[in-house]
A protein has these predicted regions:
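RNA substrate-binding interface of SAM-dependent RNA methyltransferases
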Residues: 72-162
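Active-site/ligand-binding-proximal alpha/beta "capping" segment
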Residues: 161-201, 205-212
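Fold-independent oxyanion-binding glycine-rich loops
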Residues: 7-8, 45, 86, 151, ...
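Hydrophobic side chains in well-ordered alpha-helices
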Residues: 28, 92-96, 199
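Structured adenosyl-cofactor binding patch, chiefly the S-adenosyl-L-methionine
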Residues: 197-235
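N-terminal positively charged helical leader segments and presequences
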Residues: 1-72
Length: 235
């Protein structure tokens, strides 16, 4: 069964109506070749109700479907936040964003660290990343679409967040008490080559530092592993 993330729809009785979403309607018609009675699921980008539907009527501008089942909104869970240093290639960024979404990261912040090759994200690339997140959410059946934001400096995230910095192996001591922390956790992933001293100066006092022992991984590999670890640490 196909899940669609739909920002706007109407519920009337046991019917759900979708308007002004030509991309979704075209996908049902031309890609899935859906006939009347076709079953699919729809949810909003936020963690709200999920509707299981049976197609009843369809035109070029609108579709109507019978609500077969409604799953209530999930209970609120601690959020997973990741701060990602921009990698050296757009392809790596797209892969990491896709996997963060599949893992269930709630909010993703992009940032140009001192060693970042990419220093910013133009609107077209942000739009492409948003599309990748939507497709990954639909594929993984996650309950909400991550929020994606580019920030100029980590200082804007200091308030009420516990920074866990994932970097190259270090002799610096770090604690392992994150699970008991009362503050929401924010994982930080540096670029290949590691974070610089100036980067570290931009983090709040009391941040923790962690590494994958002696392993030196590609940035995209490390980012995926750490996002999964942080998600499971919180849950």
């Amino acid at each position: 069964m196909q899940l669609f993330i739909c920002p706007e729809f109407q519920v009337s009785g046991n019917q759900l109506i979708i308007k002004r979403n030509p991309e979704l309607i075209q996908q049902l018609r031309k890609v899935l070749r859906a006939q009347m009675g076709y079953q699919f699921a729809v949810q909003a980008p936020e963690a709200t109700e999920r509707y299981f539907l049976r197609l009843q009527k369809r035109s070029d501008q609108e579709l109507q479907a019978e609500i077969v089942q409604m799953l209530p909104a999930p209970s609120k869970a601690p959020k997973t936040w990741m701060l990602l240093s921009l990698p050296n290639k757009q392809e790596k960024l797209e892969l990491i964003i896709q996997k963060f979404t599949e893992i269930g990261v709630d909010e993703i912040y992009l940032w140009a660290s001192e060693r970042s090759v990419l220093k910013g994200i133009n609107p077209n690339k942000l739009q492409r990343l948003s599309k990748i997140m939507q497709e990954a959410t639909e594929q993984s059946w996650n309950r909400s679409l991550p929020k994606l934001t580019f920030i100029e400096a980590p200082q804007s995230l200091h308030q009420e967040r516990k920074f866990i910095v994932f970097d190259l192996p270090s002799t610096q001591q770090h604690t392992t008490s994150s699970k008991a922390s009362a503050l929401p956790l924010l994982g930080v992933v540096g670029p290949e080559g590691g974070l610089t001293e100036r980067d570290y100066q931009s983090f709040p006092d009391g941040f923790e530092r962690a590494s994958l022992w002696e392993s030196v991984l590609r940035m995209e590999t490390a980012a995926i592993i750490w996002a999964w670890k942080l998600k499971n640490l919180k849950n």
